[in-house]
Amino acid sequence: MYLYARDDVPVTIYYAYKQSEADEQGDSVQASTGWETMLSAIICAGFCITGTWPMRTEMTNRSVASNTNALASSIVLVCRKRAQDAPSCTRRTFLAELRRELRPALTRMQTSNIAPVDLAQASIGPGMAVYSRYAKVLEADGSELSIRKALQIINQELDAYFTEQEGAIDEASRVCIALYSQYAFNELSFGEADVLARAKNTSIAALVRLELASAKQGSVHLLDRPELPAFTARSEESLWLVTQQVVQALQEQGVKGCATIVSSLRRIAPDSVKALAYRLYSLADQKGWTQEAYVYNSLVVAWNDIQTKALDTSKTERRQGSLLDFGA
Protein backbone atom coordinates (compact mmCIF):
# COMPACT_ATOMS: atom_id res chain seq x y z
CA MET A 1 0.00 0.00 0.00
CA TYR A 2 2.82 2.38 0.89
CA LEU A 3 4.60 1.71 -2.41
CA TYR A 4 1.53 2.67 -4.45
CA ALA A 5 0.43 5.63 -2.30
CA ARG A 6 0.98 9.14 -3.65
CA ASP A 7 2.57 11.92 -1.64
CA ASP A 8 -0.19 14.40 -2.51
CA VAL A 9 -3.23 12.15 -1.92
CA PRO A 10 -4.30 10.70 1.45
CA VAL A 11 -4.90 7.00 2.00
CA THR A 12 -8.06 5.87 3.82
CA ILE A 13 -8.26 2.60 5.71
CA TYR A 14 -11.53 1.22 7.10
CA TYR A 15 -11.35 -0.71 10.34
CA ALA A 16 -14.24 -2.53 12.07
CA TYR A 17 -13.42 -2.24 15.77
CA LYS A 18 -14.67 -4.86 18.24
CA GLN A 19 -15.60 -3.98 21.81
CA SER A 20 -14.02 -7.25 22.94
CA GLU A 21 -10.60 -6.02 21.84
CA ALA A 22 -10.19 -3.98 25.03
CA ASP A 23 -7.35 -4.82 27.38
CA GLU A 24 -8.78 -4.15 30.82
CA GLN A 25 -6.83 -3.50 33.98
CA GLY A 26 -9.04 -2.92 36.99
CA ASP A 27 -11.97 -0.67 36.16
CA SER A 28 -10.46 1.17 33.21
CA VAL A 29 -9.70 0.25 29.65
CA GLN A 30 -6.00 0.86 29.11
CA ALA A 31 -5.64 0.34 25.36
CA SER A 32 -7.19 -1.66 22.58
CA THR A 33 -5.00 -4.50 21.36
CA GLY A 34 -6.74 -4.30 17.99
CA TRP A 35 -5.93 -0.63 17.64
CA GLU A 36 -2.36 -1.25 18.74
CA THR A 37 -1.78 -3.91 16.08
CA MET A 38 -3.44 -1.87 13.33
CA LEU A 39 -1.65 1.37 14.18
CA SER A 40 1.71 -0.36 14.57
CA ALA A 41 1.44 -1.84 11.08
CA ILE A 42 0.43 1.48 9.51
CA ILE A 43 3.14 3.53 11.23
CA CYS A 44 5.88 0.94 10.65
CA ALA A 45 4.96 0.94 6.96
CA GLY A 46 5.91 4.62 6.84
CA PHE A 47 2.54 6.34 7.13
CA CYS A 48 1.56 9.26 9.32
CA ILE A 49 -2.00 9.00 10.67
CA THR A 50 -3.74 12.34 10.24
CA GLY A 51 -7.25 11.51 11.44
CA THR A 52 -9.78 8.90 12.53
CA TRP A 53 -13.54 9.16 12.29
CA PRO A 54 -16.43 6.76 12.93
CA MET A 55 -18.78 5.76 10.12
CA ARG A 56 -22.32 4.50 10.64
CA THR A 57 -21.94 1.05 9.10
CA GLU A 58 -23.30 -1.29 11.79
CA MET A 59 -26.96 -2.19 12.22
CA THR A 60 -28.33 -0.90 15.54
CA ASN A 61 -30.93 -3.68 15.58
CA ARG A 62 -28.32 -6.43 15.73
CA SER A 63 -28.85 -8.72 18.71
CA VAL A 64 -25.40 -7.78 20.05
CA ALA A 65 -26.28 -4.07 19.89
CA SER A 66 -29.65 -4.27 21.61
CA ASN A 67 -29.60 -2.09 24.73
CA THR A 68 -25.80 -2.06 24.77
CA ASN A 69 -23.02 0.30 23.76
CA ALA A 70 -21.69 -1.91 20.99
CA LEU A 71 -19.80 0.38 18.63
CA ALA A 72 -22.26 1.63 16.00
CA SER A 73 -19.60 2.28 13.42
CA SER A 74 -16.45 1.30 11.62
CA ILE A 75 -13.45 3.59 11.92
CA VAL A 76 -11.88 5.40 8.98
CA LEU A 77 -8.17 6.09 9.35
CA VAL A 78 -6.78 8.85 7.15
CA CYS A 79 -3.07 8.52 6.44
CA ARG A 80 -0.32 10.22 4.47
CA LYS A 81 3.25 9.23 3.78
CA ARG A 82 5.55 10.35 6.57
CA ALA A 83 8.52 12.44 5.45
CA GLN A 84 11.63 10.33 4.92
CA ASP A 85 13.63 12.77 7.03
CA ALA A 86 11.04 13.05 9.85
CA PRO A 87 12.79 13.93 13.12
CA SER A 88 12.53 12.22 16.48
CA CYS A 89 11.15 13.98 19.56
CA THR A 90 11.09 13.53 23.32
CA ARG A 91 8.13 12.34 25.38
CA ARG A 92 7.91 15.87 26.80
CA THR A 93 7.51 17.39 23.33
CA PHE A 94 4.93 14.75 22.42
CA LEU A 95 2.86 15.53 25.53
CA ALA A 96 3.01 19.29 24.94
CA GLU A 97 1.89 18.99 21.32
CA LEU A 98 -0.76 16.40 22.21
CA ARG A 99 -2.35 18.71 24.79
CA ARG A 100 -2.27 21.65 22.39
CA GLU A 101 -3.87 19.77 19.47
CA LEU A 102 -6.13 17.15 21.07
CA ARG A 103 -8.39 19.40 23.12
CA PRO A 104 -9.61 21.64 20.28
CA ALA A 105 -10.24 18.47 18.27
CA LEU A 106 -12.30 16.99 21.12
CA THR A 107 -14.35 20.18 21.33
CA ARG A 108 -15.11 19.96 17.60
CA MET A 109 -16.14 16.32 17.99
CA GLN A 110 -18.50 17.11 20.86
CA THR A 111 -20.01 19.97 18.87
CA SER A 112 -20.70 17.53 16.04
CA ASN A 113 -22.63 15.27 18.46
CA ILE A 114 -20.37 12.28 17.94
CA ALA A 115 -21.71 9.42 20.08
CA PRO A 116 -19.80 9.02 23.37
CA VAL A 117 -19.26 5.34 22.56
CA ASP A 118 -17.31 6.46 19.46
CA LEU A 119 -15.46 9.42 20.96
CA ALA A 120 -12.56 7.46 22.46
CA GLN A 121 -11.79 5.88 19.08
CA ALA A 122 -12.23 9.14 17.16
CA SER A 123 -9.85 10.93 19.56
CA ILE A 124 -7.07 8.54 18.57
CA GLY A 125 -6.81 10.36 15.22
CA PRO A 126 -5.53 13.73 16.43
CA GLY A 127 -3.51 11.99 19.13
CA MET A 128 -1.75 9.62 16.77
CA ALA A 129 -1.28 12.46 14.27
CA VAL A 130 1.15 13.94 16.79
CA TYR A 131 2.83 10.61 17.57
CA SER A 132 3.20 9.37 13.99
CA ARG A 133 4.56 12.59 12.46
CA TYR A 134 7.86 11.76 14.16
CA ALA A 135 10.22 8.94 13.25
CA LYS A 136 10.40 8.07 16.95
CA VAL A 137 9.18 9.42 20.28
CA LEU A 138 11.85 8.86 22.92
CA GLU A 139 11.51 8.31 26.66
CA ALA A 140 13.87 10.04 29.09
CA ASP A 141 16.14 6.96 29.12
CA GLY A 142 16.42 6.95 25.33
CA SER A 143 14.05 4.02 24.77
CA GLU A 144 11.21 4.36 22.27
CA LEU A 145 7.74 5.30 23.52
CA SER A 146 5.56 2.41 22.36
CA ILE A 147 2.28 2.77 20.51
CA ARG A 148 0.55 1.04 23.44
CA LYS A 149 1.89 3.68 25.83
CA ALA A 150 0.93 6.46 23.42
CA LEU A 151 -2.65 5.13 23.30
CA GLN A 152 -2.77 5.07 27.09
CA ILE A 153 -1.54 8.68 27.23
CA ILE A 154 -4.21 9.72 24.71
CA ASN A 155 -6.89 8.05 26.87
CA GLN A 156 -5.53 9.85 29.94
CA GLU A 157 -5.73 13.18 28.14
CA LEU A 158 -9.32 12.39 27.16
CA ASP A 159 -10.16 11.83 30.84
CA ALA A 160 -8.36 15.05 31.79
CA TYR A 161 -10.37 16.97 29.18
CA PHE A 162 -13.66 15.85 30.72
CA THR A 163 -12.40 16.49 34.25
CA GLU A 164 -11.47 20.08 33.34
CA GLN A 165 -15.00 20.70 32.10
CA GLU A 166 -16.24 20.14 35.65
CA GLY A 167 -14.60 23.39 36.73
CA ALA A 168 -17.49 25.44 35.31
CA ILE A 169 -20.15 23.29 36.97
CA ASP A 170 -21.98 24.26 40.16
CA GLU A 171 -20.60 22.87 43.43
CA ALA A 172 -23.53 20.56 44.15
CA SER A 173 -23.25 18.96 40.72
CA ARG A 174 -19.51 18.45 41.14
CA VAL A 175 -20.18 16.59 44.39
CA CYS A 176 -22.77 14.45 42.62
CA ILE A 177 -20.26 13.60 39.89
CA ALA A 178 -17.67 12.64 42.51
CA LEU A 179 -20.18 10.48 44.40
CA TYR A 180 -21.43 8.90 41.19
CA SER A 181 -17.93 8.07 39.96
CA GLN A 182 -17.27 6.03 43.10
CA TYR A 183 -20.64 4.75 44.29
CA ALA A 184 -23.17 5.32 41.48
CA PHE A 185 -26.55 5.46 43.26
CA ASN A 186 -25.47 3.14 46.07
CA GLU A 187 -25.16 4.07 49.74
CA LEU A 188 -22.01 5.26 51.47
CA SER A 189 -21.35 6.47 54.99
CA PHE A 190 -22.27 10.03 55.88
CA GLY A 191 -18.65 10.71 56.88
CA GLU A 192 -17.26 9.77 53.48
CA ALA A 193 -19.93 11.77 51.68
CA ASP A 194 -19.36 14.78 53.92
CA VAL A 195 -15.62 14.79 53.15
CA LEU A 196 -16.36 14.78 49.41
CA ALA A 197 -18.92 17.56 49.75
CA ARG A 198 -16.67 19.81 51.83
CA ALA A 199 -13.86 19.36 49.32
CA LYS A 200 -16.20 20.87 46.71
CA ASN A 201 -17.19 23.78 48.99
CA THR A 202 -20.70 22.56 49.76
CA SER A 203 -22.47 20.15 52.14
CA ILE A 204 -24.64 17.06 52.18
CA ALA A 205 -27.42 19.21 53.63
CA ALA A 206 -27.30 21.33 50.46
CA LEU A 207 -27.61 18.22 48.30
CA VAL A 208 -30.62 17.07 50.31
CA ARG A 209 -32.20 20.53 50.04
CA LEU A 210 -31.78 20.45 46.26
CA GLU A 211 -33.32 16.95 46.19
CA LEU A 212 -30.17 15.42 44.76
CA ALA A 213 -29.42 13.00 47.59
CA SER A 214 -30.93 11.24 50.58
CA ALA A 215 -29.24 11.22 54.00
CA LYS A 216 -30.73 8.94 56.64
CA GLN A 217 -29.40 6.97 59.61
CA GLY A 218 -25.77 7.74 58.89
CA SER A 219 -25.94 6.79 55.21
CA VAL A 220 -26.07 8.86 52.04
CA HIS A 221 -26.95 8.00 48.45
CA LEU A 222 -27.61 9.93 45.29
CA LEU A 223 -31.26 9.84 44.33
CA ASP A 224 -31.72 7.54 41.36
CA ARG A 225 -33.58 8.99 38.39
CA PRO A 226 -37.01 7.55 39.29
CA GLU A 227 -36.65 9.13 42.76
CA LEU A 228 -35.98 12.64 41.46
CA PRO A 229 -38.61 15.40 41.48
CA ALA A 230 -40.27 16.57 38.27
CA PHE A 231 -38.57 19.40 36.41
CA THR A 232 -39.32 22.92 37.64
CA ALA A 233 -37.54 26.25 37.39
CA ARG A 234 -35.82 25.37 40.68
CA SER A 235 -34.17 22.38 38.98
CA GLU A 236 -31.77 24.78 37.27
CA GLU A 237 -29.90 25.26 40.53
CA SER A 238 -28.10 22.02 39.62
CA LEU A 239 -26.81 20.87 36.23
CA TRP A 240 -26.71 17.32 37.59
CA LEU A 241 -30.42 17.40 38.39
CA VAL A 242 -31.42 18.79 35.00
CA THR A 243 -29.26 16.26 33.18
CA GLN A 244 -30.74 13.33 35.11
CA GLN A 245 -34.25 14.68 34.52
CA VAL A 246 -33.59 14.90 30.78
CA VAL A 247 -32.22 11.34 30.77
CA GLN A 248 -35.31 10.13 32.64
CA ALA A 249 -37.56 12.00 30.22
CA LEU A 250 -35.85 10.30 27.28
CA GLN A 251 -36.46 6.89 28.82
CA GLU A 252 -40.10 7.56 29.69
CA GLN A 253 -41.34 10.04 27.07
CA GLY A 254 -38.76 10.02 24.29
CA VAL A 255 -37.46 13.07 22.44
CA LYS A 256 -40.64 15.06 23.07
CA GLY A 257 -40.27 14.82 26.84
CA CYS A 258 -36.63 15.91 26.66
CA ALA A 259 -37.50 18.82 24.38
CA THR A 260 -40.09 20.08 26.86
CA ILE A 261 -37.39 20.40 29.52
CA VAL A 262 -34.69 21.78 27.21
CA SER A 263 -37.03 24.45 25.81
CA SER A 264 -37.77 25.58 29.38
CA LEU A 265 -34.13 26.13 30.38
CA ARG A 266 -33.30 29.73 31.21
CA ARG A 267 -30.15 29.63 33.37
CA ILE A 268 -28.47 26.45 32.18
CA ALA A 269 -27.14 26.27 28.62
CA PRO A 270 -28.58 23.18 26.90
CA ASP A 271 -25.15 22.18 25.60
CA SER A 272 -23.98 21.91 29.23
CA VAL A 273 -26.41 19.02 29.62
CA LYS A 274 -24.90 17.29 26.60
CA ALA A 275 -21.36 17.91 27.88
CA LEU A 276 -22.20 16.37 31.25
CA ALA A 277 -23.74 13.36 29.49
CA TYR A 278 -20.40 12.82 27.73
CA ARG A 279 -18.60 12.94 31.08
CA LEU A 280 -21.04 10.56 32.78
CA TYR A 281 -20.85 8.15 29.86
CA SER A 282 -17.07 8.08 30.22
CA LEU A 283 -17.31 7.37 33.96
CA ALA A 284 -19.93 4.65 33.53
CA ASP A 285 -18.04 3.02 30.67
CA GLN A 286 -14.81 2.89 32.67
CA LYS A 287 -16.65 1.27 35.57
CA GLY A 288 -18.36 -1.27 33.34
CA TRP A 289 -21.85 0.04 34.19
CA THR A 290 -23.33 -0.96 30.84
CA GLN A 291 -26.90 0.23 31.35
CA GLU A 292 -25.80 3.57 32.79
CA ALA A 293 -23.41 4.14 29.90
CA TYR A 294 -26.18 3.24 27.47
CA VAL A 295 -28.59 5.93 28.69
CA TYR A 296 -26.00 8.71 28.46
CA ASN A 297 -24.89 7.57 25.02
CA SER A 298 -28.54 7.51 23.92
CA LEU A 299 -29.03 11.09 25.10
CA VAL A 300 -26.11 12.44 23.06
CA VAL A 301 -27.13 10.45 19.97
CA ALA A 302 -30.65 11.94 20.23
CA TRP A 303 -29.40 15.46 20.98
CA ASN A 304 -29.92 16.97 17.52
CA ASP A 305 -33.52 15.73 17.47
CA ILE A 306 -34.05 17.04 21.00
CA GLN A 307 -32.76 20.50 20.09
CA THR A 308 -34.86 20.62 16.92
CA LYS A 309 -37.98 19.62 18.85
CA ALA A 310 -37.14 22.09 21.64
CA LEU A 311 -36.86 24.91 19.10
CA ASP A 312 -40.23 23.97 17.61
CA THR A 313 -41.74 23.89 21.10
CA SER A 314 -40.38 27.36 21.89
CA LYS A 315 -41.73 28.78 18.63
CA THR A 316 -45.17 27.28 19.30
CA GLU A 317 -45.23 28.74 22.82
CA ARG A 318 -44.26 32.19 21.50
CA ARG A 319 -46.99 32.06 18.84
CA GLN A 320 -49.57 31.06 21.42
CA GLY A 321 -48.41 33.87 23.68
CA SER A 322 -48.72 36.37 20.83
CA LEU A 323 -52.25 35.19 20.06
CA LEU A 324 -53.24 35.58 23.70
CA ASP A 325 -51.79 39.10 23.77
CA PHE A 326 -53.64 39.96 20.56
CA GLY A 327 -56.91 38.59 21.97
CA ALA A 328 -56.48 40.66 25.11
Q: What is each of the regions a protein language model found here?
A:
Residues 1-50:
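Conserved Class I SAM-dependent methyltransferase catalytic core
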Residues 15-19, 51-57, 81-83:
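Short, flexible loop/turn elements at secondary-structure junctions
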Residues 18-33, 65-70, 111-114, 233-234, ...:
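Short, contiguous acidic/charged loop-to-helix segments that flank catalytic cores in large enzymes
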Residues 26-33, 37, 44, 54-72, ...:
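Class I S-adenosyl-L-methionine-dependent methyltransferase catalytic core
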Residues 62-114:
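Flexible, glycine-/basic-rich loop-and-beta segments that form/coincide
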Residues 107-328:
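C-terminal accessory/interaction regions of large nucleic acid-associated machines
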